[in-house]
Every structure is written in structure tokens, then in C-alpha cells.
Amino acid sequence: MKNIFIVLIFLFLSSCAEVKAQDKQHEEQQIIEQEPLQNNETPQEANQESINSANTAKSVLHNHDNNQTESVLTQDLHEQKKTAITTKVTFKIDNNDMVLGNKKSNVIVVEYFSPTCPHCAYYHQTIFPALKKKYIDTNKIAYVVREFIATKQDLDAAILARCKGDINSFIQFHNIILQQQDKWAYSNKYRELLTDIGQLGGISPEEYKQCLNSDKITETLIANTNLVAKAPKFIGTPSFFVNGVQTENYSIDNISRAVDRALEDETKSK
């Protein structure tokens, strides 16, 4: 009888231990589930914050990639690019635009570039000179250069180029920034290097600092970025819009074909 009683006590204690273990496991699970909901966040707020963070990361990655090499594009992206070239977006020249050529021309070419974009640097060094000679120097078109800001480096470099505010200074720094891209864009000391570039072009460190703190310049750059970011199927930088229609890529043949077509249409309409 005594042995039976001992066995019953043993079974009772085992059962209690198991219940306590289950309760502890349940509490730990609740804690784990509640960990993301810190700082008095609701589940909906926490979920939205995660979504926003993911979207921001995807946006920066997409914008800074800038790789338009055909071999890495999937079939879906090929289809998106085909759709993009038929999409028309309204672009009007405003007082903040940097314009080359004939401002009064009805054929407006808008280039979107990022100061840290390698393809943009390549375009300006190898393709742009021929287009400039054919269309800009002859005053056939209005050529608008707009920045697409994807990184802090892009912003600081674009501010330097716009610091003095005139077109000649802008082009001077625009060219130097792209030519020297590999020396400053990927350095931890990019701000110092941009400051040095500014001094060589006649902008003192104090002037550059004032421009960096200028809300007007920053707002212009962000507005330029937001405008094209809303364009359907925007394919990254460099991108070109001829009278609002995006070209397929930045080859001289594609851009020239689009410009010639626009000039022809303009002649017929007169």
C-alpha cells in the first residue's frame, strides 16, 4: 500500500512539472511574438514599418544598380523596357533646369543621370560629345540635364555641381565629377574629395558647406528625382526622354533616331 502511495505521489509531481513546463514554454512564445511590438507599437504599425523598410531597401538597391546590360535582364524586364519606350511623360522646362542648346526649341531632350552611376560616366565620355555636336551646338534641341538622387554621395555631388547656380559652372563640375567618379564616389572620404574638387573649380569649403545646407538646391534635386520616379517603367540611369517619350537605351543610334523623328514631326507641323 505504501509503495502504491509513493507511485501516486511521483505521478502527481511529474504531471505538475509537465504543466509548469508547458506554461513556461507558452510564456516564452508570447514574449517572442511580442518582441517586434516595442515602443508601444500596434501589430499593424510594426508590420507597416517592416514593409516600409523593405521598400526603402529595394528602392535604393534598384536605383543604385543602374545596370542595363542585356545579358542580365530577365524576360520580364525585357517586356517592361519595351513598354517603357511607349510611355509618354510630360516634362516641362522650369527655372531650376540646367539647359544646353536652344531653350526655345520644341524638341526637348531630358537626360536623367546619377553622379555615382558608371553608365552615366561612360555615356558622357563616349556618346554625349557626338550628340552635343550634332544637336546642341547647332541649337536644334533643348537638352535638359537632371539628377536622379539614389545615394548620399549623389546628393552631395549634385549639390556641388549646382552650387554657383549658372549653367557654365554646372557643366564644369558635372564633367569633372563624372570624369573623376572612380576617385571619390566609392570612398569613405567622398565629402572631403568633393570639397577638394570644389576648390579646384573656385568653390571654397565655406561656400560648399553653405550649398550643402541650402534647402532650395536640395528641394530641386529631390523634385527632379520624384518626378521621374513616378514615371511608369522607369528603367534607371542614364535615361532619356525625347518630348516625353522614353528611349529604349542610351546608345547614340537610339537617341539620334528619337531626336530625328521629333525634329521631323516638328517640321511637318509648321
Swiss-Prot record:
Compartments in which it is found: Periplasm
Disulfide pairings: C117-C120
Top-tier EC class: oxidoreductase
Gene Ontology cellular component annotations, sorted alphabetically: periplasmic space
Signal peptide: 1-17
A single GO molecular function term of this UniProt record: disulfide oxidoreductase activity
Keyword Disulfide bond: yes
Domain Thioredoxin: 71-264
Keyword Oxidoreductase on entry: yes
Keyword set, alphabetical order: Disulfide bond, Oxidoreductase, Periplasm, Redox-active center, Signal
EC number: 1.8.-.-
Function: May be required for disulfide bond formation in some proteins.
Similarity-based family: Belongs to the thioredoxin family. DsbA subfamily.
Entry protein name: Putative protein-disulfide oxidoreductase RT0103
Protein source organism: Rickettsia typhi (strain ATCC VR-144 / Wilmington)
Lineage: Bacteria, Pseudomonadati, Pseudomonadota, Alphaproteobacteria, Rickettsiales
